[in-house]
Each structure stands twice: as structure tokens, then as C-alpha cells.
Amino acid sequence: GDGRGILFGQIETPQGLRDLHIKGAGKTPYSRFADGRAVLRSTIREYLCGEAMHGLRIPSSRALLMFGSNELVFRETTETGAMLVRTAKTHIRFGHFEYLKHNDKREYIEELLDHVLAEYFPDLVDREDKYEIFFEKTVQSTAELIANWQAVGFAHGVMNTDNMSPVSYTHLRAHETQRYL
């Protein structure tokens, strides 16, 4: 992604563990050239679209809270800064696996995959074919998620590995919410 997100913990809910993730808090080691900030305008849009997905019964991250800041953020114009605290089953993305592969840290790929299986696919953990079945389930659930988007006229603006989760839920970034049809 653009390095604006910080995963800062998990909470126990009636639906199980949920990640707490803040977006727009500032620079992270992954911010690259960006400032790590979010602006109020796009944060409001992301909040509304994520809640719309939830209301339409399409798996989505949820906004726990959103707040503006006194800090000005420079984009095309000067804008009010903002932060969004999101919850989701996980913030693990396909991109995490991709990052490990491209940075020659392949020894961690199986460890991350085993973590995903233990947390979100425990019925597969002891199977010899666990990785193949996981792949099949992920392809199927991702296809169903995208079909649900299409059924309500949503077109995801950036279908890349940063925005796709192995547990198949809608992960929005503010600039992608403009593509609601």
C-alpha cells in the first residue's frame, strides 16, 4: 500500500478477534515517498462506502471511528488531515506474501501462511493438502466477493495485492470509493 496504515492490536468481539488498524497516522517504514497522512474528504468517503458495503451484506472492513486533525495535509490543495480506525478479521493481504517473495524472505512465507490457516481456516491445519485447499477456497471466496460487488454496481478501483485479502472481504482505500457506479 501507500504506508499510511498501522496495525495496533486486536480486540475480542462476539464474532471473534478483530484487528484494529489506524489509517492516516503518519509516516511508516513503508510510506516510501508519501507523508502517511489521510485527508478528511476522502476519509469520510471511505467510511461511508465501507458502511454501505456492510449494509449491503458484502464482507467489508468496518470503520470504528474517524476524526479530523488540526494538521494540514498537502495534496492538490491544502486539506484537513484525518485518521480512520478500522476493524477487520485481518489486515493480512496477498501483498504481504508478495513482499516476502520479492525481498527474498521466502522462509517466512510458509510461516505467514500457516498463521493465516491457524487463525482463519483451522479446519485445514492438519490436512496434507492444506495449501491447495486454502488456495481453492480463497479463489472461490474472492470470486464470490467480486460477484457481490458487481451485483450492487461497485467496481474496485485498484485490484492489486495491497487490497486483496486471503479471507475475502472488501478493503477500500479512499480514492477507490469514487468508483461506485
PLM regions and their residue ranges:
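Glycine-centered, phosphate/nucleic-acid-interacting loop/turn motifs that mediate DNA/RNA or nucleotide
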Residues: 153
